[in-house]
Amino acid sequence: KYIAFAFGASAFIFSGCSDSFLDKTPDERVEINTPTKCVQLLNTAYPEGSYGWVCEISSDNIADNNAPHYPSNPNAKQILTHYNLGTYDRTDDEMYRFEPGVSSTSQDSPSFLWNTFYNSVHAANYVLEAINDGKVNSDGSGYDLKVAAAEAKLIRAYDHFILVNVFSQAYKDPEASKKDIGVPYVTVPETNTGVKYDRGNVAEVYDKIQQDLEEGLAGISDANYRTAPKYHFNVNAAHAFAARFYLFKRDYKKVIEHANAVLGTDSATIYSQLMDWAPFDSCSSSGDYAKVWQDFNSSNNLMIMGTYSNIMRHALGYRFALVGQPARDVIFHSSPMWQSYAANPSCLVGGYLFWTGEDYGYTAGKIAERFQYTDRLAGTGFVHTMRREFTRSELLLERAEAEIMLGQYDNAFQDMNLYTRGMQKFSPATYRTYQSQARMRPLSRDMLDSYYALSSNPNCFADWNFTQQMSSSFVVPAEAVKYMNCLNDLRRFEVLWDGLRFFDLKRWGIEYSHTYGPDATVYTLKWNDPRRALEIPAAAIQAGLQPSHSTTETPGSAKKVAFDEFFSDPTPSAVSASNNAKLDNSESYVIKK
């Protein structure tokens, strides 16, 4: 079989270890007939799109600068204000109003996400077909074909996991999810033109993901990753993916099993491997912060993915941003874990407060871009954002959530306490500063019993009965509410800008709203709103796939469609190299006495 090797974001990342094989022109056909070629194709098989911005603007983390809102900083004069800012992309306006995002097909659009993830599926299927057909001959490289096949299955499972969570309703339970439209689960290369697909249902897609995931886990090792294991589904990343999958499926014992495979159970060891905030002391530019966050050698980072994404530009100085109430809920609020500061000190240390100099919103150094010039004279090229797709910090919170839902409250407290200690793992000098000025301390049981028991505090609810709308089996008992409030607060901070907040809102059944424009029009998403599943690309609908927002068709009732009819090659757009990010003055967040 043959495939054209895409020379995109993944190849950009791997340029330091590429050889003549990867330097082939994009349209040159290469036969996949050796272990080396299988492994090299897998190097570039990871999705080049990012779900970060698409999901952030669809969540409660983004507000409209042009709608009346109070300043982000509680220390500022509290008067309602609104601006007259333009959008970075017309699709942002559509998505913020929970409409189909159809005006753009370039990076950070639903169409680009759809096509890049199916392109990744396409490449994984080529590797699997070559191996399964027995067409791969030994070349003395020492690469293990079983490991290559396992990696391909993990890529395919991951791609469909993201696709179904973006373009379908959240998983509810085995029966209820049969009534929700899924996504095509593609298992053969495009060359098999006789194979056609429908969207099936969410339950079917989850079953197929689980099969690929379990088969991938059974065969994966780090044997084939000789230079850059964290750009692949290494063993730890595979277990982290499994923990996330089973959390979304609410198989909590398996969440803990796979989290333990990575984290272990020794608190001192886990703490030592969480994010190290000390290197931020020497950072000043967004690029400096990005290097620390995205550090390949960081023990906290389990898997890093290179993407075409302009996420920092979308949210910096334009209409839709982390501003006003969302900014307060995530960053700008007091807490018993820090006092005398109106902002989370971890945000001040870790570079979460990049802005334009006006209160138009904030972005974080963790999503700062790396620029690839295509025309230095014109100053244009492609923006790459490195995603920290799986981290120990997030995995620790996933384990804590599973422990809460199993009634293991002591274990959940220990994990959340450990997470908050990790949030404060500053250099000694920086820690002394914030401990004395902000009176920093980790989560305590008193905080759980007081602060997190009050629904008036950010990210806290009086009860979590809304989860039962998703499934009668999804019950958060009264004694677990304060733990889930704490988990929600910590997790919302941890996954900020990653896109995962949108998935959390969906899977928990949380109702939320967007306020739009100077007239303050309110758009609300209830737990079962069809718009909680983003609309698939117009071209896929025209080919015959069911729309996500269909209310008349049952899953699988539309005609079946060939892969090349609902997929097209994704094409990123070149942009200018300049951006206007600068770090805010943290002194403005000291609470005035």
Could you say what each language-model-derived stretch is?
Residues T87-F167, G200, L213-Y225, T380-R387, ...:
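Conserved, well-structured interaction surfaces
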Residues K1-G16:
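Sec-dependent bacterial lipoprotein signal peptides
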Residues S58, I256-S393, N417, M423-F474, ...:
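Hydrophobic-face positions in mid-chain alpha helices that act as interaction patches
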Residues S18-D19, I220, V235-M275, N585-K592:
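Aromatic-residue-lined binding/catalytic grooves and analogous aromatic/hydrophobic interfacial grooves
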Residues C17-P74, L322, I331-F332, G509-K593:
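Membrane-proximal, proline-rich intrinsically disordered regions
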Residues V205, D212, G219, H258-A261, ...:
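Alpha-helical solenoid repeat scaffolds, predominantly canonical TPR units
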